[in-house]
């Protein structure tokens, strides 16, 4: 262990990518009771950030918000959904280095492997964004 706490945000081009709250219903929230838990770098053992220790009430609110968001998402046109997914893909790829740095610190894996994982995972977003344009009805023709 080199030190007990790593200032991971200082290693990022865009430190806002290191979220230390939970995203629920369009807002970044802390635990109702303010409790947190440490996220440690398994390769070094140092703490890279503290995250909210959400309880039952916060989890129930998150599930309710996700259910409502799904209805809103389903109401979008195929083209709108494709545009959102494309934007998400573009953002992932534009921030690949920072996301890989976070992944490396969180998982302890080599940076090159983390960069590949970001690209690979993002390729699924790109694929489904393209598929979102294709509305066939209930069954995709075979």
Language-model segments: which ranges?
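Terminal low-complexity tails and localization/encapsulation signals of metabolic enzymes
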Residues: 1-50, 83, 87, 135-142
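Glycine-rich loop-to-alpha-helix module at the N-terminal edge of alpha/beta enzyme cores
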Residues: 46-136
